[in-house]
Curated annotation (Swiss-Prot):
Name of the protein this chain belongs to: Small ribosomal subunit protein uS7
Subunit comment: Part of the 30S ribosomal subunit. Contacts proteins S9 and S11.
HAMAP family: Ribosomal_uS7_B
Assigned keywords, A-Z: Ribonucleoprotein, Ribosomal protein, RNA-binding, rRNA-binding, tRNA-binding
Gene responsible for this protein: rpsG
Gene Ontology biological process: translation
PANTHER family, sorted: RIBOSOMAL PROTEIN S7
GO cellular component entries: small ribosomal subunit
NCBIfam families found in the cross-reference section: rpsG_bact
Pfam families, per database record: Ribosomal_S7 (PF00177)
Family statement drawn from the similarity comment of this UniProt entry: Belongs to the universal ribosomal protein uS7 family.
InterPro entries (alphabetical): Ribosomal_uS7, Ribosomal_uS7_bac/org-type, Ribosomal_uS7_CS, Ribosomal_uS7_dom, Ribosomal_uS7_dom_sf
Any GO MF annotation of the entry: structural constituent of ribosome
Length: 156
């Protein structure tokens, strides 16, 4: 156990347009090299594209996409007697959201559309419908956990 004191979680200010803390956190995941205004423009642009194409509430679509991507279990490496086992463990809620956001941004960056807002909008809409690269990543993680269920007694 570390002897230092436990660092308190910093309060994240909600985003200015929608007043959503989750969206503000997502903007921080999109941000590169500390350029927050650029990440805001990308995220708001993506949400505008979603509203334009779907005619639905873009924030609801975004939250539905995040819910679909959130993993329930993941595997962690555990070394036991010279062998390394992939042990399935439950993911705590804060990490679920962080992983979902990371996977969503990574999948959007790998897409083929011209602009980042278009890529992000496409990935969010796909994830809301239960498809896309971010959903595939979640399914792969769940499949790995299912395949290694036999080692779950090596819990941490």
């Amino acid at each position: 156990m570390p002897r230092r004191r436990v660092v308190a979680k910093r309060e994240i200010l909600p985003d200015p347009k929608f007043g959503s803390q989750i969206l503000a956190k997502f903007m921080n995941h999109v941000m590169v090299s500390g350029k927050k205004s650029v990440s805001e423009r990308i995220v708001y642009g993506a949400l505008d594209i979603i509203t334009e194409r779907k005619g639905l509430d873009s924030l609801e679509t975004f939250e539905k996409a995040l819910d679909n991507i959130r993993p329930a279990v993941e595997v962690k490496s555990r070394r036991v007697g010279g062998a390394t086992y992939q042990v399935p463990v439950e993911v705590r809620p804060s990490r679920r959201t962080a992983l979902a956001m990371r996977w969503l941004v990574d999948a959007a960056r790998k897409r083929g559309e011209k602009s980042m807002p278009a890529r992000l909008a496409g990935e969010v809409m796909d994830a809301a419908e239960g498809k896309g690269a971010a959903m595939k990543k979640r399914e792969d993680v769940h499949r790995m956990a299912e395949a290694n269920k036999a080692f779950s007694h090596f819990r941490f």
